Regions:
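N-terminal hydrophobic/helix-forming segments and targeting peptides
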Residues: 1-301
Length: 301
């Protein structure tokens, strides 16, 4: 499996929370030759089952992405936006986007230039209220091709960086779905001492709804959730993020301590470098929802 090509392929697909049909169909086909059974549920989560002898283990990563949605078409043809998931408006000015209307339309996100702002305005951050998408057409034409509720996704093509680094949109959390695919490939010809369920969950970015329903359907004995975290950069406050040279194990009330220790011991045995992260309340990931399924599921993140 060419991991770099896989990352480029899986991050290019649109799969906004609540609109994952296309990307879930893609992942279902990728898993099909690697496992015994693949299903896509009503929430568009993909459940790939490798049958084995032992407890049911749920390995979960989410396939949905944050994005934007058209809320209004202005008289000049520009589009107003709402968010789907946790979009930070500060990064949006001058961003390139795709509007998924009756046709797929390219656009750029515009904002009032700082030269025309008052001092008070310049002191405030951008919000969705003062941003718009310019698709370069009249209001009449825009209304023929775009409807309220159409999705707007980011144009962030995959780029390979130096030192085996990689840049793309949707690495949260398609990079972890790629890990699930690679794991399924590695286990393909082995007889496992566990019943393994690879779950590509939907709607994580809007509350973990796909993981919740998948965990209810599977009723796993334990779960391992894969997600991304904050990477250390020059502007990060001390101790607020971690370097990207190791995997991160989360500690906190939403993860099961004994299972966490088994994960850490296994990593040490195989010389896998780990960093530690603390989530003192909820984790903000699918682990929160899976852990509360049915009578409870021991989970690690």
């Amino acid at each position: 499996m060419d991991v770099k090509k896989l990352l480029a392929d899986v991050t290019a697909l649109p799969g906004v929370s609540g609109h994952e049909a296309q990307v879930s169909a893609y992942f279902a086909e990728q898993f099909r030759p690697l496992v015994d059974e693949v299903t896509v549920d009503a929430m568009y989560s993909v459940i790939a089952h490798k049958k084995g002898n032992g407890p049911k283990i749920m390995l979960c990563a989410h396939l949905d992405e944050i994005a934007l949605m058209v809320t209004h078409i202005e008289d000049d043809g520009s589009l107003r936006l709402g968010n789907v998931g946790g979009v930070d408006p500060r990064i949006l000015p001058a961003s390139r986007v795709w509007v998924h209307g009756r046709e797929k339309l390219f656009g750029t996100i515009g904002a009032l230039p700082p030269h025309l702002m008052s001092a008070a305005d310049r002191a405030n951050n951008y919000t969705l209220d003062n941003l718009h998408v310019d698709i370069g057409m009249s209001a009449e034409r825009a209304k023929e091709l775009v409807r309220i509720g159409d999705l707007v996704t980011f144009d962030g093509p995959a780029r390979e960086l130096l030192n085996d680094q990689f840049s793309s949109k949707t690495l949260d959390d398609r990079s972890c779905v790629a890990i699930l695919l690679r794991a399924a490939e590695m286990l393909q010809k082995l007889v496992c001492d566990a019943d393994v369920y690879f779950v590509c969950s939907s709607q994580e970015e809007v509350g973990g709804r796909g993981a919740m329903t998948s965990a209810f359907a599977i009723d796993p004995d334990l779960s391992v959730v894969l997600d991304v975290d904050f990477a250390e950069t020059p502007t990060c406050p001390p101790r607020s993020a971690l370097p990207i040279d190791a995997m991160i194990v989360t500690h906190g009330p939403f993860v099961q301590p004994k299972l966490n220790q088994r994960l850490i011991d296994c990593a040490k045995k195989h010389h896998v470098k780990l960093n530690a992260n603390v989530a003192s309340r909820s984790t903000g990931t699918d682990a929160d929802e899976i852990g509360l399924s049915r009578a409870g599921v021991p989970s690690v993140l």
